[in-house]
């Protein structure tokens, strides 16, 4: 019987815990939830484990405050970091880039621990600002670039397709598109490669309407923060789990993700959202 895969999620907050929920519900892999808050990962892991008889999954789910129990993970999802919260003095929300100083220290320490205990793992970075945190993980881990991948385009693409489906009143299953570039204002949706049941989207709506959808997609994270007072987590977790599934099942799915470029697309030494083939070992060539 083949050994079950093992996925560690660092950061047991909203995104991390929701990702753990869906990994368990899909029976993908054993799960280790890690957080610095004592009791929180243990409690969430136990709560999730108690759902097993209802959902029908049969996995080992552990919550911990140390990294020893994460040893030999196949995939490590890093969600740890300071979230986007309203400043009580200014009433403003920080941009992703304003989080870089604090989160680079957090992600750096997490990455060093992960690399120590799971030297063969694929790292899926979710912490913001995404591109900068991917650089931190690459530098601190010493891993080859193929094993560092950022969750960016998968979420942005999901938002883009959702807004198109809402505008046209069609099933999201019939909308196909892709969002590349940076995670945030620098994202680049591809209108001429967007279709609904094979019909180019610009034959179904005018350019002004599509441009409004693109702008809403760029501001999608901020829209959720403005409504909730904190970052969204259902869609980010779902996008993350789609990447984890592709890796642990070696699906070789093409998923837009932040990858470290060394000459591809004319760019060097930076992380950018591009179409990548995700499978066992991380980013491959198909």
Model-found features: residue ranges?
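Rossmann-like NAD(P)(H) cofactor-binding subdomain of soluble oxidoreductases
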Residues: 91-161
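Conserved S-adenosyl-L-methionine
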Residues: 25-30, 142-144
């Amino acid at each position: 019987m083949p050994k079950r895969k093992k996925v560690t999620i660092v950061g047991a907050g909203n995104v991390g815990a929701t990702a753990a929920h869906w990994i368990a519900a899909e029976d993908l892999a054993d799960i280790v939830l890690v957080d610095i808050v004592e009791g929180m990962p243990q409690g969430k892991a136990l709560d999730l484990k108690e759902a097993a008889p209802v959902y029908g999954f049969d996995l080992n789910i552990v919550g911990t405050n140390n990294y020893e129990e994460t040893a030999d993970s196949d995939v490590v999802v890093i969600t740890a970091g300071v979230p986007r919260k309203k400043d009580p003095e200014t009433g403003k929300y920080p941009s992703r880039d304003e989080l870089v100083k604090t989160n680079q220290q957090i992600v750096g320490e997490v990455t060093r621990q992960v690399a120590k205990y799971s030297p063969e793992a694929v790292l899926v970075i979710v912490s913001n600002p995404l591109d900068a945190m991917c650089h931190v993980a690459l530098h601190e881990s010493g891993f080859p670039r193929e094993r560092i991948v950022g969750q960016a385009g998968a979420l942005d693409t999901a938002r883009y397709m959702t807004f198109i489906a809402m505008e046209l009143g069609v099933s999201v299953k019939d909308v196909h598109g892709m969002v590349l570039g940076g995670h945030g204002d620098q994202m680049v949706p591809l209108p001429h490669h967007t279709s609904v049941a094979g019909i180019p989207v610009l034959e179904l709506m005018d350019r002004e309407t599509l441009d409004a959808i693109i702008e809403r997609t760029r501001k999608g994270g901020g829209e959720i923060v403005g409504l909730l007072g904190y970052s969204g987590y259902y869609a980010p977790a779902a996008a993350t789990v789609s990447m984890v599934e592709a890796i642990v099942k070696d699906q070789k799915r093409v998923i837009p993700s932040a990858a470290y470029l060394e000459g591809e697309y004319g760019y060097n030494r930076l992380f950018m959202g591009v179409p990548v083939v995700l499978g066992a070992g991380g980013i491959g060539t198909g």
